[in-house]
Amino acid sequence: MRCWPHCKAHNSPLPPGFHRPDPASALQKSLPMTSSLLQRLGIALPIIQGPMTGSDTPALAAAVSAAGGLGMLGCGMRSPAAMAEAAAAVRQQTDRPFGMNLFVQATPNPDEATVQAAMERLAPLYAELGLQPQRPTQWCEDFAAQFEALVALRPAVASFTFGILDAAQVARLHAAGCLVVGTATTVAEARAWAQVGADVVCASGTEAGGHRGTFLGDFTASQVGTLALVPQCVDAVDIPVIAAGGIMDGRGIAAAQALGAQAVQMGTAFLACPESGIGPAYRQALAQAQDTDTRLTRVFSGRPARGIVNAMMEALAAEEDRVPAYPVQNALTGALRRAAAAQGRTSHLSLWAGQGVGAVRALPAGELVAVLADEWRAACGRLAAAA
């Protein structure tokens, strides 16, 4: 018999011949679609490690998958060759399912005046690190080539952000055996993904760290919180919904399920794991951050993204509206951010993190998944007992 010590009723004696049902089990039975989605994903727990381009690693994805969750590789800035290398590395470490994420984007052709103005704006910041800004050799990876690599690699899950696929592309991924997940920051975007045949929608609230995935309408209008976004998406589409944004522990997982989500995607929660790809300076910033230390900014990449406030964010705040759109600004600041990481300078790093950063835990990924699972089961029990 399992007791939940917070509930006084559970400590009272039972009449002979009676037994007390497991509240966690009872709640799970009330969420049958959760088990259905987990079966489709091929995982035991409703925990998905968020794809974090530049910060995740094959070791992180493999550890999460091996622990019963779903590990993800953020491939938005990986070349097709690097995508293949990363996928092979995951498969060498685990035979469990994993996913890969791409940015749906077109390669830009910015005018020279825009590029030159942006480089001049960044020159003082480069100078602080003893460097001069240089024009990048490419603005971004070619999405068409990345997509072909994704189809060939056949991960269990293919997820997308920044834009939307067409129905033919979704059909190709289905033929390759991939479950297609589309990121939505609004109800309209969730409906759009359902209409092109996506299997799952990831509803990403404004609390989430890193880049906003908005592709319909204005970024400002799309700043809907997870608590408001998830149930509206659940009601709007007939496909499963994954909740993302601000979820850091098992209580958040249970809360998301209570809203109708069938799993959660957690990025910031896994950033401090030793398997992640961030450097010492970034780790120190995470350890010191509080709940009020993040905000959305365009200064690093040209696309709104949530990160820990630092000197570069503040220095360019007045110029934010003039920053060229992603991926141009992202490419122009790339060398600066790499140099800052090498020099241990948090002042010039894009310290992507969500509003839950104050609750980050520096645990090995597999151990963190186990802790999250225990917390989730306990929270399910509390919800069942309160019902």
Protein language model features and the residues they cover:
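Short, Lys/Arg-enriched N-terminal segments with co-localized hydrophobic residues
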Residues: H19-P32
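Conserved active-site-proximal phosphate/metal-binding subdomains
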Residues: H211-L216, T220-I242, I247-A387
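Active-site entrance/lid segments in N-terminal catalytic domains of soluble metabolic enzymes
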Residues: L31-A236, L372
